[in-house]
Amino acid sequence: MARYRRHSRSRSRSRYRRRRRRRSRHHNRRRTYRRSRRHSRRRRGRRRGYSRRRYSRRRRRY
């Protein structure tokens, strides 16, 4: 029984590590995209709403 418990623990640990690594990568990517969006928003304008709609769709996909 102890052996099984130990195995499950190590498995969960590896899973957490993988998830954490992926999350940090995604966060950095999101930050850069957000910066670019700020600039594009100024040029095109908020009244159009097309870029905003596209961004929300992209965000959901990511």
Swiss-Prot record:
It comes from the Eukaryota. Belongs to the protamine P1 family. GO terms for cellular component: nucleosome; nucleus. PROSITE patterns: PROTAMINE_P1. GO terms for biological process: chromosome condensation; sperm DNA condensation. This is Sperm protamine P1. One of its GO terms (molecular function) is DNA binding. Keywords: Chromosome, Developmental protein, Differentiation, DNA condensation, DNA-binding, Nucleosome core, Nucleus, Spermatogenesis. Signal peptide: none annotated. Protamines substitute for histones in the chromatin of sperm during the haploid phase of spermatogenesis. They compact sperm DNA into a highly condensed, stable and inactive complex. Testis. Residues 1-62 are annotated as: Disordered. It is found in: Nucleus; Chromosome. InterPro entries: Protamine_P1.
